[in-house]
């Protein structure tokens, strides 16, 4: 812990210097561009160098000391690779989220809990556009993405997503790698108001999404801030929480403490909670 905090202080100091130079350079640029512009770019360089060197080392050490300890205590771990994530093609071909042109993924975890296999990673999908004068960045998804094997043998494609303004269109079709899907309406009005469901096979949708399963989906929604997305593809169920955060990343603005262990453990226990709510854990193992 002491080694982590010593490194954190160095990152904090360099980050503060970089931010200060950028702000001062920007302000001076209005009246004294000859001085302001160099300061601004020096601040950018300091920021990039910090992130690429000591900042990266601090993050990796944090994950090896804190994240790995929690993960190995809770799960039978086959792989935990902080710098690795889900493949961009894998994510985009699911069509569970809108596809952007900027993608990153890290904290790849593969393992078992009470014999149930899972994979998990943090995913960040954005779309960046520019008109030559201004650049606009829109975040489509930022959060955790976990994959489980579905107990019921559902081979068709299905998407269950919490409704929001401009939540995305219907997945599938001629120009997609997934089949055509139709919107499914259920008798539960409250469920229809809160979620939209698209399925390749409506019979599979009604077979899986029973009144009991609807309540489980609602329970998952209450479990986490942000938007819930559940996708089914190739007999796998994908559970996505778009909460615009990454609980596995350390903060340089506060000391590393026991609170960090709690934050990471809470994040990892969400995997167990999802398994429990969806009934993935065999009854004799609960």
Question: What annotation goes with each model-predicted range?
Answer:
Residues 9-31:
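Canonical alpha-helical transmembrane segments of integral membrane proteins
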Residues 37, 49-50, 176, 250:
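Generic signal for short, ordered secondary-structure residues
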Residues 26-44:
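Hydrophobic alpha-helical transmembrane segments
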Residues 1-10:
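Cytosolic juxtamembrane N-terminal segments of multi-pass membrane proteins
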Residues 68, 72-77, 81-286:
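Charged, low-complexity intrinsically disordered regions
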């Amino acid at each position: 812990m002491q080694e982590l905090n010593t490194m954190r202080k160095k990152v904090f100091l360099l980050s503060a210097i970089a931010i200060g130079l950028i702000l001062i350079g920007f302000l001076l640029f209005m009246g004294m561009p000859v001085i302001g512009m160099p300061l601004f770019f020096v601040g950018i360089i300091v920021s990039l160098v910090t992130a690429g060197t000591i900042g990266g080392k601090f993050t990796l050490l944090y994950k090896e000391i804190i994240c790995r300890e929690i993960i190995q205590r809770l799960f039978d771990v086959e792989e935990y690779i902080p710098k690795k994530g889900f493949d961009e093609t894998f994510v985009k071909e699911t069509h569970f989220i809108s596809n952007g042109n900027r993608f990153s993924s890290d904290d790849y975890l593969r393992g078992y809990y009470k014999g149930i296999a899972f994979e998990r990673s943090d995913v960040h999908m954005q779309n960046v556009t520019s008109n030559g004068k201004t650049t606009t960045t829109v975040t489509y998804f930022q959060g955790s993405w976990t994959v489980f094997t579905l107990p019921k043998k559902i081979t068709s494609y299905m998407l269950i997503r919490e409704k929001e303004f401009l939540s995305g269109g219907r997945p599938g079709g001629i120009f997609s790698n997934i089949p055509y899907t139709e919107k499914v309406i259920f008798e539960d009005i409250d469920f229809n108001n809160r979620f939209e469901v698209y399925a390749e096979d409506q019979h599979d949708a009604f077979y899986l999404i029973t009144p009991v399963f609807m309540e489980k989906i609602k329970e998952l929604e209450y479990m986490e801030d942000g938007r819930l997305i559940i996708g089914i593809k190739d007999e796998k169920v994908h559970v996505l929480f778009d909460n615009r955060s990454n609980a596995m990343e350390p903060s340089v603005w506060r000391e590393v403490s026991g609170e960090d262990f709690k934050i990471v453990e809470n994040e990892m226990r969400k995997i167990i909670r999802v398994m429990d709510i969806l009934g993935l854990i065999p009854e004799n193992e609960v």
